[in-house]
């Protein structure tokens, strides 16, 4: 489907020179003099190469239709990440380039949304929150529960975050998968 360059957004998939690209960022620039342009940063799906393109906002680009489906995460090996479609039990392998910064938050059985073009995964969307265990943090200090200060902690997936002073090692907490920030103590 041909669309004007100014309508391209992050997460869209474009076809250029017979290759598929996922849009990492898209910015419309309106200089004081000259023609407005769209600065688009993309990653080639086949090999992960990042490129940056500049189009006039009125130029047409080829946008590819993608389908979002739920998949369960199975495991990771040297070849990539393996997911299963719950209804048909079809399995797909997703490369490390596509998973990117979502990798530390993947847990066995976690349901994620994969954006698919034909049989190729082009993007992954995690649930907003994940429950993880604190494996290393400073000891709990009595009398600090009323303060709003935070202390550093390392989670079971290796991500570093800031937690309230009353959270100790071994505590399960809920974090945002977008940035790893603390939300609450887990209720399980």
UniProtKB/Swiss-Prot annotation:
One of its GO terms (cellular component) is cytoplasm. Pathway: Protein biosynthesis; polypeptide chain elongation. GO terms for molecular function: translation elongation factor activity. Keywords: Cytoplasm, Elongation factor, Protein biosynthesis. InterPro entries: Elong-fact-P_C, NA-bd_OB-fold, Rib_uL2_dom2, Transl_elong_fac_P/YeiP, Transl_elong_KOW-like, Transl_elong_P/YeiP_cen, Transl_elong_P/YeiP_CS, Transl_elongation_fac_P. It is found in: Cytoplasm. GO terms for biological process: peptide biosynthetic process. Involved in peptide bond synthesis. Stimulates efficient translation and peptide-bond synthesis on native or reconstituted 70S ribosomes in vitro. Probably functions indirectly by altering the affinity of the ribosome for aminoacyl-tRNA, thus increasing their reactivity as acceptors for peptidyl transferase. Belongs to the elongation factor P family. This is Elongation factor P.
